[in-house]
Swiss-Prot record:
Heterotrimer of A, B and C subunits. One of its GO terms (molecular function) is ATP binding. This is Glutamyl-tRNA(Gln) amidotransferase subunit A. The gene is gatA. PROSITE patterns: AMIDASES (PS00571).
Length: 486
């Protein structure tokens, strides 16, 4: 049920907020042991919040836009008084003394916290297998990964363990799991949504966004969480449009660009390619014009990203040294050993790998050859997008080259794991808004994701095109049956 339909039923008194919360809790008790999408459950407080909303409605009070909607929150967003672990032993016992801006805005709008979701440790991964607390399973096939790093949020939405969720996206961590789990995942323009209270991975790339079962809900949630925040110096001080007012507008005459380099990729699965091109044809039937465009440096994004992101991570994660908070190694004789053993034992292998890569790239003898060169290539990638948007309104690609892969398939091959973000990374490097939504299923009944990319701050058009495609294609109405899917 969409947020709009839920709100209508709540306002008419056809259903209570407590009833919805109890439905979600019952669903969690039914399938969570199989999926492991949550790290922390907030059931009793959620019920108490729902009762307050029902009392306000009964008293005739005007309800906020997300009143009673149950949310799951990725466990790298700070929630005051509630554990926020980043799926790491390093922060296993960390309880933030403050609330992140995005969650604060959700609760003010009437949203209810159901729980905190699993992720790759410190959001570094593409499968949710690097979590210190165990992997999350894909609800379409529990032998496969849900994607990452926001795999817990994607799996929870797909399986009906919440109505919507928040995740973070540094190189595809919302869109890739959305693709693997058959849900909608939106990465806004860099700076459109505050990062205050998001535990940093790579500060020039991180962005918070929603997961939902439909584009309309994503638009409603973005409307609530977007907007200027003086506590985040990178947060843009620009008006936030009413996205929901525009998603039903016709896309006739819009120019959709198919990025040539994405469809020529050697590793692109043929079923994925076929589904995405069929989606492009559907958009054409709605009146859009299809234009092939070239972004020559698009596929250089992954090499660029894996210099810049680890470099920023090595700086951001330097604060975890056992001195002020977080895990601290015991039975050490001096400060130097305490720091070394704290980091060696507190961080998992993937986080350590990226810290080492970043430290190397920033070292005195290599900073010009690697980090500064990567920043130059990042500028060229951004210029490719700028040139493309002179001729088109929206860009279209697959979200990921493949559907969800088997658990453990890439654990000993980091490069193969990294390549699953090949098509999502460039939008992060350029700071562009992007969305993934289902566009079909492969022969194994696994969902395939369509990625749409818009120009800076053009989420309105992005959501409009995504919504029009979703309404016309009705992909999820013909989805294969699964007991773990909502």
């Amino acid at each position: 049920m969409s947020i709009a339909k839920w709100r209508q039923k709540l306002n008419k008194g056809e259903v209570s907020s407590l009833e919805l919360i109890n439905q979600q809790i019952n669903r969690i008790e039914e399938v969570e042991n199989t999926l492991h999408s949550y790290l922390y459950l907030n059931h009793e407080k959620a019920r108490a919040s729902a009762i307050k909303i029902d009392e306000a409605r009964a008293a005739g009070e005007e309800l906020p836009p997300l009143a009673g909607v149950p949310f799951a929150i990725k466990d790298n967003l700070c929630t005051k008084g509630i554990p926020t672990t980043c799926s790491s032993k390093m922060l296993e016992e960390f309880i933030p003394p403050y609330e992140s801006t995005v969650t604060q805005r959700l609760w003010k709008a009437g949203g209810i916290l159901l729980g905190k979701t699993n992720l790759d440790e410190f959001a570094m991964g593409s499968s949710t297998e690097t979590s210190a607390f165990g992997p999350t399973k894909n609800p379409w096939d529990i032998t496969r990964v849900p994607g990452g790093s926001s795999g817990g949020s994607a799996a929870a939405v797909a399986s009906g363990l919440c109505t919507a969720a928040l995740g973070s996206d540094t190189g595809g961590s919302i869109r890739q799991p959305a693709s693997f789990c058959g849900v909608v995942g939106l990465k806004p323009t860099y700076g459109r949504v505050s990062r205050w209270g998001l535990i940093a991975f790579a500060s020039s790339l991180d962005q918070v966004g929603p997961f939902s079962t439909n584009v309309s809900d994503a638009a409603e949630i973005l409307q609530v969480i977007a907007g200027h925040d003086p506590r985040d110096s990178t947060c843009l001080d620009v008006p936030v449009p009413k996205y929901s007012d525009h998603i039903s507008e016709s896309i006739s005459g819009l120019r959709i660009g198919l990025i040539k380099e994405c469809f020529d990729q050697e590793g692109l699965d043929l079923e994925v390619k076929k589904s995405v091109l069929k989606a492009a044809d559907q958009l054409q039937s709605l009146g859009a014009e299809l234009i092939e465009v070239s972004c020559p440096r698009f596929t250089d994004g992954i090499a660029t990203y894996y210099v810049i992101a680890p470099s920023e991570a090595s700086a951001n994660l330097a604060r975890y040294d056992g001195v002020k908070y977080g895990y601290r190694a015991k039975e050490v004789d001096n400060l130097s050993d305490m720091t070394a053993f704290t980091r060696a034992r507190g961080f998992g292998s993937e986080v350590q790998r990226r810290i080492l890569i970043g430290t190397y790239a920033l070292s005195a003898g290599y900073v010009d050859a690697y980090y500064r060169k990567a920043q130059q290539v990042r500028t060229l990638i951004r210029r490719d997008f700028e040139n493309a948007f002179k001729n088109v309104d929206i860009l279209l690609t697959p979200t990921s080259p493949t559907t969800a892969f088997k658990s453990g398939a890439h654990q000993n091959d980091p490069l193969a794991m990294y390549l699953s973000d090949l098509l999502t990374i460039p939008a992060n490097l350029a700071g562009l808004p992007s969305i993934s939504l289902p566009c079909g299923f492969d022969e194994k009944a696994l969902p395939i994701g369509l990625q749409l990319i818009a120009n800076v701050l053009d989420e309105t058009r992005l959501l409009q095109v995504a919504h029009q495609y979703e309404q016309a294609a009705e992909i999820m109405n013909s989805a294969p049956e699964s007991s773990l899917i909502n």
